[in-house]
């Protein structure tokens, strides 16, 4: 699987175990090119709009139900309702902390490919944050007795408020990437371990889970990537994101002013490093049509090169089903 929660107390033996499913809630706030303003795709009705109403089913119920049945779920729209967003990255010094520790046999080094860097707060059409920075890599080692001489990277965020935050990691898929990169998420509920297949899905945000964190900067609120692996190769480290955040894509010289989860998929796709033709087939002239196509284009690009979509170039994620609530 792309992502596996090793700390899960039960192992799903049937059902959707290790199945990869794409789910989206459709619509979302978008830029109306003809009116030069942001707005909803559907009319207001009974004190809501379809752009908001479908999310009230998909985010708290449908996606968790599928995940509890064993599935790995991807959504092309932002899934986290947290308005705050903190990114910890080797390229972007801030109040948060990024730390590397090597071992006797393995040292961190710069990878030969581009990585994520947040060099601005507002992005224009076509700008890709996953092409603006660098990423790090280190050779893997077998598990050691008594956990001595371990190599790892740490991302320690300085969070503006106590609350629940989605945790997204990122990396680049390298020629000798491993399928069992070990991530540990330290949060208020303890420590949760994940194995991430870095052979697929490089160059975008990879969702691990949503956790409770305290305000500020502390050693029980962080993400750790170890170089421990059962395979001979490398693990890659890039930015880690805490929280869904606010929309930061400018259209017509203005941003939506809304949390990212309320925006359409077109803008989440750009922030997630998707190629321009995935989210802007109309070359920035029709965001409504682009948003409709972005949802499926993102899934096709993610699954490109996998057994389910072998002829299209992409990130190799074996997404075998798409489900949407319209």
Predicted regions and their residues:
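Functional beta-strand-loop-alpha-helix junction segments that form "active/interaction loops"
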Residues: 74-85, 261-311
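Short beta-strand-plus-loop segments that form exposed binding edges in beta-rich domains
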Residues: 223-234
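Non-catalytic propeptide/linker segments at domain boundaries
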Residues: 1-39, 76, 237-258
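Short beta-strands within extracellular/lumenal beta-sheet-rich domains
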Residues: 133-159
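Extracellular carbohydrate recognition and processing domains
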Residues: 188-217
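Conserved small/polar residues in nucleotide/adenosyl-binding loops
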Residues: 326
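Short, surface-exposed beta-strand/strand-loop-strand elements in extracellular ectodomains
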Residues: 173-192
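A short beta-strand element within beta-rich, extracytoplasmic domains
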Residues: 151-175
């Amino acid at each position: 699987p792309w992502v596996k929660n090793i700390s899960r107390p039960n192992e799903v033996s049937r059902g959707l175990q290790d199945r990869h499913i794409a789910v989206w809630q459709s619509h979302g706030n978008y830029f109306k090119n003809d009116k030069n303003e942001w707005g909803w795709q559907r009319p207001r009705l009974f004190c809501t709009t379809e752009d908001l109403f479908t999310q009230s089913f998909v985010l708290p119920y449908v996606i968790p139900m599928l995940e509890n049945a064993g599935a790995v779920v991807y959504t092309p729209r932002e899934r986290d309702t947290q308005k705050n967003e903190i990114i910890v990255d080797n390229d972007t010094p801030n109040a948060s902390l990024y730390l590397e520790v090597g071992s006797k046999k393995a040292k961190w080094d710069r990878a030969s490919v581009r990585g994520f860097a947040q060099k601005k707060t507002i992005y224009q059409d076509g700008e890709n944050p996953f092409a603006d920075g660098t990423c790090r890599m280190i050779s893997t080692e077998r598990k050691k007795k008594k956990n001595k001489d371990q190599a790892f990277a740490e991302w320690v965020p300085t969070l503006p408020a106590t609350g629940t935050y989605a945790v997204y990691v990122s990396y680049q898929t390298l020629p000798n990437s491993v399928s069992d990169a070990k991530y540990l998420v330290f949060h208020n509920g303890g420590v949760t371990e994940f194995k991430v297949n870095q052979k697929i899905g490089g160059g975008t945000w990879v969702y691990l889970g949503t956790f409770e964190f305290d305000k500020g900067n502390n050693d029980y609120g962080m993400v750790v990537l170890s170089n421990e692996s059962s395979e001979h190769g490398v693990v890659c480290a890039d930015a880690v994101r805490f929280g869904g955040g606010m929309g930061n894509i400018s259209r017509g010289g203005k941003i939506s002013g809304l949390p990212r989860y309320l925006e359409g998929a077109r803008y989440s796709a750009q922030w997630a490093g998707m190629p321009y033709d995935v989210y802007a087939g109309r070359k920035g002239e029709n965001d409504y049509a682009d948003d409709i196509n972005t949802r499926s284009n993102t899934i096709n690009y993610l699954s490109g090169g996998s057994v389910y979509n072998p002829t299209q170039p992409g990130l190799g994620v074996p997404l075998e089903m798409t489900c949407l609530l319209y």
